[in-house]
Amino acid sequence: MEELIHLAYAIDTFYFLICGVLVMWMAAGFSMLEAGLVRSKNTAEILTKNIALFAIACTMYLFLGYYIMYSSPEGGFLPNLGFLIGEENTMDAVLSGGEDAPYYSMRSDYFFQVVFVATAMSIVSGAVAERMKLWAFLAFAVVLTGVIYPVSGYWTWGEGWLDAAGFSDFAGSGIVHMAGASAALAGVLVLGARKGKYGPNGEVHAIPGANMPLATLGTFILWMGWFGFNGGSELKMSDIDSANNVAQVFVNTNAAAAGGVLGALILSKLWFKKADLTMALNGALAGLVAITAEPLEPTGQGAALIGAVGGAIVVASIIFLDKLRLDDPVGAISVHGVVGLWGLLAVPLTNADATFGAQILGAVAIFAWVFIASLVVWLILKAIMGIRVSEEEEYAGVDIAECGLEAYPEFTKGSK
């Protein structure tokens, strides 16, 4: 019997770590997606942001964020602060066999959680692209990953007051994606739109991305990484029930992404009279975000429908935000924020234990906390160091101004 417990512990720990690696691979997906959707003169800077934010997220969560997010007391509003991850699980604790016996390594839990933090910050990167100062962005990343995200994470996954209120978010439609979009929205409001994006009479000028093949590759990488994002949130797979659950989560994750693509393509055809690749890519991501709140309970067909609704929502949301003159170069606020809200509200449709009241409460609480806290931080950064590059630097491209190099030097010389 002891040998079986040892084996189950090893399997669950290894599964957790592999899923964490898949989620880390999503950082490459975000990098490629954003690099493809910005103009060539801004590519090196956005790639720099993505690798730097990942390093900052890993560091801040290691030294501070993890201890805020997983602190006592249960059901509380304000977290306590510890200073050590603590001793690893002992053999006696694992072999005790009780309901509370640990079944995976604490270090694997930390590793899985830290890559989620980086995902939340990656969402901000694309929304403020092409006009934000690099170091202002990185300073904000320190605060979001070290404090803002962990506090709302404590309320939910850390068994705080939202968890006690019955809020349900399996893998993070709200906790990760809507939180990242809320921080992005605050940044966009303080930062303003790119030069030339909107005309004086309400015109919206398209600013195409430089490399759609790269953006498409990034989307497929994210699609792949999402299997770890949702599948790992089952937390184990060493018994029959959990293994079956993981398989269902994988099926539903894939079905929702496919539904999102079709929903976005069909609405784009009806609305614009053409198939829009950018909308299709965002539709895939929207389907993935939508199912993330509850990827286990729906049938595969139900997951496809949830994803299709998300794909349609993202098309309408991107157009609507442009009408409001909220400039989001990659559609991150729509994909992760608006569709993240849809994902939370869809949970009670398939999960009998969830309620619309608790889901709405959780959505409002997460948005209010992250948006207000982020807005304060953005305003402080604006006052202290400025957050926007000069007009000349924006027209020339932030690659040279912020990084001193270009991603495509043969093609961007003198480009405006």
Language-model features: where?
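Hydrophobic alpha-helical transmembrane bundles of multi-pass membrane proteins
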Residues: 1-416
